[in-house]
A protein has these predicted regions:
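Short functional linear segments
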Residues: 1-46, 53, 59-66, 71, ...
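Residue-level signal for inorganic ion chemistry
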Residues: 10, 47, 68, 130, ...
Length: 369
């Protein structure tokens, strides 16, 4: 199978959407000898900050001279960036070879990518695999591990409520489902619905460490990573990872951020300039907490260009998003083409914020690199 054929097969899987249950994944992995259970896996769940925790843990392990695989989503620039070993993307032919193993399995898109990840990490002989849950926990297709080495939790908040539940407690219960008997667990500082996690840990006889609060979302994520490294016997402070579309700066005049929920908005505010007018290029998916995001970010903006994401059915139209945005910023225009929206934002010399969606970040980042 060629890389192009592998990507085409994955695109064909997109129409399957999200399907409940782990039976398809377990059956597919069983045909490989359940190689996921031959890996030392740090399994990371949460609503915000999972990618930072994963990257920081991997950084510490690499500096301790371990060979480390990382699985993190969504991708921004290259599809293969979701699966890396020692910071290098899975080679195209290796990707195609792993896809071919599962080509006839009835897997969804994300299930197929996850199966490829576990097989590639096994074939690559990684010392550790740092695996980020895609969504949720108990029902997430990464959750086919009999005995993860450590389970870690980033911040838990409301998101993906149609799939995970409409309360923080329900979401925490779903995410805590990655915990396995006897597995050490690391919790985000003052994690929401902590009793849910503690109850699960007591039931499964799991030792629990709560990271110390640092007072800043990024520092709190690093504290979680630091506790994971300590449990692994690594005496190295985690470095601050630079991740695409996570408060990513392009020069002094543009910030690209894919956060899309109220907690992500609150973290973003800490990185916005207070002494310059801000022009926001904004797109959002219709299933997000639109008002909860906009009410925090847009009062900091002088003007907003609402746009959309071509070919993304879940994206709000530019006009509908502009109507919602006018509640929080008086100067709002709609421009359906995101590239023209960026050009319009640059017209007055303001600080530019591109925000609201990883899909928008993926589209715009092509103009910036």
């Amino acid at each position: 199978m060629t890389y192009e054929a592998a990507i085409q097969l994955i695109k064909q899987k997109q129409s399957l959407g999200v399907q409940p249950g782990l039976s398809r994944m377990l059956a597919a992995m069983e045909k490989t000898g359940s190689v996921q259970n031959k890996l030392q896996v740090i399994h990371v769940a949460g609503t915000n900050g999972k990618g930072t925790v994963c990257a920081a843990v991997a950084d510490g392990l690499r500096r301790a001279e371990y060979r480390v695989g990382v699985f993190s989503s969504p991708w921004v620039t290259d599809f293969r960036e979701q699966i890396t070993v020692d910071g290098r993307m899975i080679p195209k032919q290796d990707f195609a070879d792993c896809v071919e193993v599962f080509a006839k399995e009835p897997l969804t898109e994300f299930e197929l990518i996850t199966a490829v990840m576990y097989l590639y990490f096994y074939r690559s002989g990684v010392d550790y695999a740092v695996v980020e849950c895609g969504m949720g926990g108990a029902g997430d297709c990464t959750n086919v591990l009999a005995h993860p080495t450590v389970c870690a939790f980033a911040k838990v908040a409301l998101d993906h409520m149609a799939f995970l539940g409409d309360t923080v407690e329900a979401i925490a219960r779903e995410k805590s489902g990655i915990i396995k008997p006897g597995c050490p667990v690391v919790l985000y500082p003052l994690i929401a619905a902590k009793d849910v996690f503690l109850e699960q840990c007591r039931a499964l006889n799991c030792p629990v460490t709560e990271a110390a609060q640092q007072g800043d979302p990024i520092a709190d994520d690093l504290a979680v990573a630091g506790e994971v490294l300590r449990l692994l016997g690594v005496d190295t402070a985690p470095g601050l990872p630079m991740l695409p579309a996570r408060r990513e700066h392009f020069g002094e005049n543009l910030l690209l951020d894919g956060a899309h929920n109220p907690d992500g908005a609150a973290a973003l505010l800490l990185h916005l300039p207070t002494d310059r007018p801000i022009a926001a290029v904004l797109a959002m998916m219709e299933d997000k907490d639109i008002d909860g995001y906009l009410c925090q970010v847009l009062p900091r903006c002088r003007r907003v260009i609402a746009t959309t994401v071509p070919g993304m059915g879940r994206a709000l139209s530019a006009e509908d998003l502009a109507a919602a945005a006018r509640k929080y910023c008086p100067d709002v225009t709609a421009e359906p083409n995101p590239h023209r929206a960026l050009a319009a934002a640059k017209a007055d010399g303001d600080f530019i914020l591109v925000c609201g969606s990883f899909y928008l970040a993926r589209e715009i980042r092509k103009d910036l690199i």
